[in-house]
């Protein structure tokens, strides 16, 4: 089969450095018997060692040319191929506990992370390679430039850890940016205390929708000036100053104050 050319519409950059590949696989530490799914196996740089260590692997791939290569290379007993868009894939069908890994396409990384977060209850952990600037947003702390909606919503559900960086030269073709490896471990359900997570998402989206505006303005759909002292929060702050716990407290306060907010979330 002829050499596959990376496709921009799928955000393809193929990992090719054997030392980096080994380091990533060691960080994942796959063990036979685990249910592991790789998103975007590409040319199989991570697929080969994963199959070797696990015995069987699930993959989700949208590129039909790459799917044909995978069918040629692996037997169904070793590799289960799920053809389609990872953004629409129901990861719950693979069972639990599930481990999710992959070199995520840069062009869909943020919506894909939000999609994957929906399956947190069924996941043991997730280890991804992403654009470094996205990873910095994922692990950012309150009060920093990178802290935003992605930070809050992922940190509400996961314990996040940036493991190490991957230089552009480790890929073919080489991207213009550095990548990072991030691990996401779901938090226990008892630590996720928002009474309604859909409402939490709305509150966080509003707080960061216009970053230069204060909470007094961004949250006025739900909170009056008198509500902020009850919460112990300064209405003159901007969204990036609040912790995840602050957003949960605001959400639960709104839910208690106005049951309609829950119904409309």
UniProtKB/Swiss-Prot annotation:
EC supergroup of this enzyme: transferase
Pfam families the UniProt entry points to: RrnaAD
Binding site for S-adenosyl-L-methionine: 13, 15, 40, 61, 85, 103
Catalytic activity: adenosine(1518)/adenosine(1519) in 16S rRNA + 4 S-adenosyl-L-methionine = N(6)-dimethyladenosine(1518)/N(6)-dimethyladenosine(1519) in 16S rRNA + 4 S-adenosyl-L-homocysteine + 4 H(+)
UniProt-annotated location(s): Cytoplasm
Database matches in PROSITE patterns: RRNA_A_DIMETH, SAM_RNA_A_N6_MT
PANTHER family xrefs: DIMETHYLADENOSINE TRANSFERASE, DIMETHYLADENOSINE TRANSFERASE-RELATED
Name of this protein: Ribosomal RNA small subunit methyltransferase A
Organism of this sequence: Aromatoleum aromaticum (strain DSM 19018 / LMG 30748 / EbN1) (Azoarcus sp. (strain EbN1))
Lineage per the UniProt record: Bacteria, Pseudomonadati, Pseudomonadota, Betaproteobacteria, Rhodocyclales
């Amino acid at each position: 089969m002829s050499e596959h050319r990376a496709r921009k519409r799928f955000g393809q950059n193929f990992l090719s450095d054997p030392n980096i590949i080994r380091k990533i696989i060691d960080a994942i530490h796959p063990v036979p018997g685990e249910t592991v799914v790789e998103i975007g196996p590409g040319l199989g740089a991570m697929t080969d060692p994963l199959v070797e260590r696990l015995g069987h692997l699930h993959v989700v791939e949208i590129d039909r040319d790459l799917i044909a290569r995978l069918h040629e290379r692996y037997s169904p007993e070793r590799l289960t191929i799920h053809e389609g868009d990872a953004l629409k894939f129901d990861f719950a069908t693979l069972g639990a506990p599930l481990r999710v890994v992959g070199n995520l396409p840069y062009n869909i990384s943020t919506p894909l992370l939000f999609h994957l977060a929906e399956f947190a209850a069924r996941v043991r952990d997730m280890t991804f390679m992403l654009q470094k600037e996205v990873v910095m947003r994922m692990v950012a702390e309150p009060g920093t430039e990178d802290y935003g909606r992605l930070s809050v919503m992922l940190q509400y559900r996961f314990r996040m850890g940036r493991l190490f960086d991957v230089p552009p030269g480790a890929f073919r073709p080489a991207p213009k940016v550095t990548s990072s490896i991030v691990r996401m471990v779901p938090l226990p359900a008892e630590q996720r205390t928002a009474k309604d997570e859909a409402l939490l998402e709305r509150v966080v989206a509003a707080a960061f929708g216009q970053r230069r505006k204060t909470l007094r303005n961004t949250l006025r759909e739900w909170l009056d000036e008198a509500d902020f002292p009850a919460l112990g929060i300064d209405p003159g702050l901007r969204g990036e100053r609040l912790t995840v716990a602050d957003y949960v407290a605001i959400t639960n306060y709104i839910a208690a104050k106005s049951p309609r907010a829950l119904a409309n979330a």
